[in-house]
Structure formats: structure tokens, C-alpha cells
Amino acid sequence: MSFTGTLDKCKACDKTVYVMDLLTLEGNTYHKSCFRCTHCKGTLVISNYSSMDGVLYCKPHFEQLFKESGNYSKNFQAGKTEKPNDHLTRTPSKLSSFFSGTQDKCATCKKTVYPLEKVTMEGESYHKTCFRCTHSGCPLTHSSYASLNGVLYCKVHFNQLFLEKGSYNHVHQAAANHRRSASSGGASPPSDDHKPDDTASIPEAKEDDAAPEAAGEEEPEPVVES
């Protein structure tokens, strides 16, 4: 079996990678055997890796080195002292100057976002778990999201809610109505059309009912004595 013409190079060892041994992540190519944590050399899989400036880590060591204190300069120095390696020796000054004291906040939940869990879209930062469709809650990706006034949607529901109607006015109006309903604290009072008619509760006198009374007022006929 030959793989003539392949030019893919492993990001870790810079050697040719053939299809049978290929892993592609974040636009970079790796041998499966080279896809390892820089800190502990443990083998990584797609579900348990993290990266910083192209350097690979398992999630436990990434959190230990970067996330716990929020100060990347301190964590890099601690990592280098505990277990020196080529990547940490070359890169701490660049990373620490860029990430020291990060104050990025998630546009959805307003909490701090660390690089391990950050998605950046249209100048806003999000936790990966917060980057979801507002309508259905489904996870979004760079290629599947749409937004209106900073509100996130999947493209399917964006098309369903907005594009099919050809106007956004009904969306803004629905939001305004919802806010007014919430501030009123309950249902609105009934209109005049639904108020009971006071006169309807007074029954009208019937002719049959009035007849006995009228008959009682007639003078009795005289009695004829024999």
C-alpha cells in the first residue's frame, strides 16, 4: 500500500504523517503516537486534550498549570521547576505576558473564561458550554451559529424564527410584550365589554305576576239577600 504524494508533517516531530497514522486537530497534523501531553507524556485523545499556543497538555495538567490561580506566569514557573521540558523552557515568557491576569468574561453567564474553555466569536468570549442556541439549547460551532443583537441561535432556528417571516419586528415586539407582562405581576383586568350589566340582575315584572294583585283590588260584588 502506498500513499504517494502526501505532504502532511507531524506538528510534534516534523516527520511525514500517513493516513493510517493521522490525527488532525485545530488545523495541525500529528502522528497518533506523538499526540501526547507535553508535561506527563501521557497519550491524549480528542476528548481529553487541551492546548496552549500549539503545545499539547492533558486536561488535568493544563488546569494545574494554567487555570487554578488565574496567574499564568506563576503556573508556568511552577511547572518548569517541577518538571522542566523543552516546550516550557522556550515559551513561558510569551504565554505569561499574554495571559497573566486574564479578565475575559463569558458574554452569556458573565463569569471568567479561561483559555481551556473559551470560544471567541464576533469579539465576544464564551464558555464552550454556554455557546448554545437560545431557542433550543443545542451546542453551536463556528459554522452553525447565527446571532441577532448578541443573542445566539443555531442556523436552523434562526431561519425558522426570522428569515421565513422576512421581518424582525415581531421578534422585538414579542420581547417587549414579555417584559411588560413580567413587570405587571399578573393578568390584566377585564375590559368593559366583559363587565356584568347591573341592570341585568333586576328581573322585569311579568304580566302574569301582576295579574293577581290587580284582581285583588277589584270591589266585591254585593250579596243579594233572599
Swiss-Prot record:
One of its GO biological process terms is: actin filament bundle assembly
What start-end ranges are recorded for coiled-coil regions in this protein?
Answer: none
Output compositional bias ranges, type Basic and acidic residues: 191-209
Query: Does the record's keyword annotation contain Signal?
Result: no
What Pfam families does this protein's entry cite? Answer: LIM (PF00412)
Q: Where is the composition biased (Acidic residues)?
A: 210-226
- Sorted UniProt keywords: Actin-binding, Cytoplasm, Cytoskeleton, LIM domain, Metal-binding, Repeat, Zinc
For this protein, the record's PROSITE patterns field holds: LIM_DOMAIN_1, LIM_DOMAIN_2
Tissue distribution of the protein = Predominantly expressed in flowers, in the tapetum and in pollen grains. Detected in leaves and stems.
* Entry superkingdom: Eukaryota
Q: Which InterPro entries match?
A: Znf_LIM
Q: Where in the numbering of this chain does the LIM zinc-binding domain appear?
A: 8-68, 104-164
- The segment annotated Disordered runs over 173-226
Q: What does this protein do?
A: Binds to actin filaments and promotes cross-linking into thick bundles. Has an actin-stabilizing activity. The actin regulatory activities are inhibited by pH > 6.8 but are [Ca(2+)] independent.
The extra comment attached to this record reads: Cross-links actin with a constant of dissociation of 1.3 uM.
- Quaternary structure and partners: Interacts with F-actin.
Q: What is this protein called?
A: LIM domain-containing protein PLIM2a
The organism's lineage is: Eukaryota, Viridiplantae, Streptophyta, Embryophyta, Tracheophyta
